[in-house]
């Protein structure tokens, strides 16, 4: 691997892309540390320390939300905008036609960017009133109060848009998926809380709860097993044999060789996890912002409590959303009819099947089976730590969602780097 890095460093374009990606990540982490003016973040500590949905969102932002920094909103506005635009693309024919145009993806990305700005503005307004109600503002009345409100809301909104820009810059000029890498850096930066979790386990064990001497090693072993499981399942694929017919071009005989169509078990990567997390967090986040009083509003209190991170119904909804998004993304990314038509145009066929509809039907059946296995894999890895946390009564910070995102992004980025090097006849990580 060290030799691979040395080889990569010798390629000027790849070296520049790596340095650019690191520079953007440094800018992002700096933005997560720059405090918003006129806010006393220490007054918000209690709100983020109860293991609620805000604590979870704070973990996804690398602690920027609880510290009221420039990038406090994180990637949530852009993710929610992406969900809305992609769902509308399927539902509205005009947007679907735009997506099919040569520059359709650029137009949809522009629409997503505008939608993300609107969502960021709404979230900024909500967070401002939460900060105000918690007594964390230095000025709340008069001209100073109005100026403070404008500055805080504008800063949060601009920060969210700047995050979107950072992700797009990595996509264009860096290595890997920009959005995923930003989330990756946020999660990794927040893993210092693992030391607090381990210290808490040891303290409880020293206080007489000796079972935690056994629970801690088991937890570490489970984390390693989950990592290995994620790596295996992420790289697993179903290969469909493709046979190309022989044809004569001039005096040369072309084709006749066998190839394969790779269908990855986890085709969608970590995006279903990220999108499901963003969507299911909305009610719980609203409830945390509103601070509903149980005595005054028992119905709404019970409703928002239902979407608490540790609620059984939250787990069920989270699981179903992961399954749904997994199928949704496979459906919009892979078209069996188009694949079958491409094979027929290139004189390729699946042994034992006629070109056309029989081939597309076979690919559809195979995709459905693989997608089900991949969706169950994502759901189990994401939900298992939540269930274990509920059973043990402890908040497991190294959750399946964060672990899956970190491992998945690392593998995707490594694969991108390997592909870049393979095109230049260098031995890559995976070769």
Regions inferred by a protein language model and the residue ranges of each:
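N-terminal cationic and glycine-rich segments that engage phosphates or anionic surfaces
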Residues: 1-99, 103-431
């Amino acid at each position: 691997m060290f030799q691979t890095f040395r080889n990569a460093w010798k390629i000027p374009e790849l070296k520049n892309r790596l340095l650019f990606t690191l520079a953007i990540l440094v800018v992002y982490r700096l933005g997560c540390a720059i405090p918003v003016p006129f806010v006393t973040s220490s007054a918000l500590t209690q709100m983020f320390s109860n293991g609620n949905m805000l604590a979870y969102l704070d973990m996804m932002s690398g602690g920027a939300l609880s510290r009221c920094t420039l990038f406090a909103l994180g990637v949530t506005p852009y993710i929610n905008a992406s969900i809305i635009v992609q769902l509308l693309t399927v539902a509205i024919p005009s947007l679907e036609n735009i997506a099919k145009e040569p520059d359709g993806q650029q137009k949809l990305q522009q629409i997503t960017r505008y939608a993300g700005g609107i969502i960021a503005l709404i979230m900024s307004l909500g967070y401002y009133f939460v900060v105000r109600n918690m007594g964390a503002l230095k000025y709340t009345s008069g001209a100073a109060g109005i100026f403070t409100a404008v500055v805080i809301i504008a800063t949060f909104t601009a920060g969210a848009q700047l995050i979107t820009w950072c992700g797009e810059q990595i996509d264009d000029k860096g290595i890997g998926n920009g959005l995923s890498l930003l989330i990756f850096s946020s999660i990794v930066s927040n893993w210092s809380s693992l030391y607090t979790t381990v210290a808490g386990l040891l303290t409880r064990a020293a206080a007489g709860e000796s079972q935690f001497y056994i629970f801690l090693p088991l937890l570490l072993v489970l984390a390693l097993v989950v990592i290995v499981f994620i790596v295996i399942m992420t790289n697993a694929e179903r290969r469909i044999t493709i046979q190309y017919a022989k044809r004569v071009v001039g005096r040369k005989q072309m084709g006749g060789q066998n190839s394969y169509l790779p269908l990855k078990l986890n085709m969608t990567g970590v995006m279903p996890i990220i999108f499901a997390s963003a969507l299911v967090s909305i009610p719980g986040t609203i409830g945390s912002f509103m601070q509903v009083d149980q005595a005054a509003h028992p119905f709404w209190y019970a409703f928002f409590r239902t979407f608490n991170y540790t609620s059984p119904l939250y787990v069920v909804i989270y699981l179903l959303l992961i399954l749904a998004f997994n199928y949704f993304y496979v459906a919009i990314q892979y078209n069996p009819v188009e694949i079958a038509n491409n094979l027929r145009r290139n004189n390729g066929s699946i042994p034992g099947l006629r070109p056309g509809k029989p081939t597309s039907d076979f690919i559809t059946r195979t995709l459905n089976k693989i997608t089900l296995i991949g969706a169950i894999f994502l759901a189990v890895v994401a939900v298992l730590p939540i269930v274990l946390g509920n059973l043990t009564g402890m908040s497991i910070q190294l959750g399946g969602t964060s672990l899956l995102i970190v491992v998945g992004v690392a593998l995707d980025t490594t694969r991108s780097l390997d592909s870049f090097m393979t095109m230049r006849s260098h031995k890559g990580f995976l070769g």
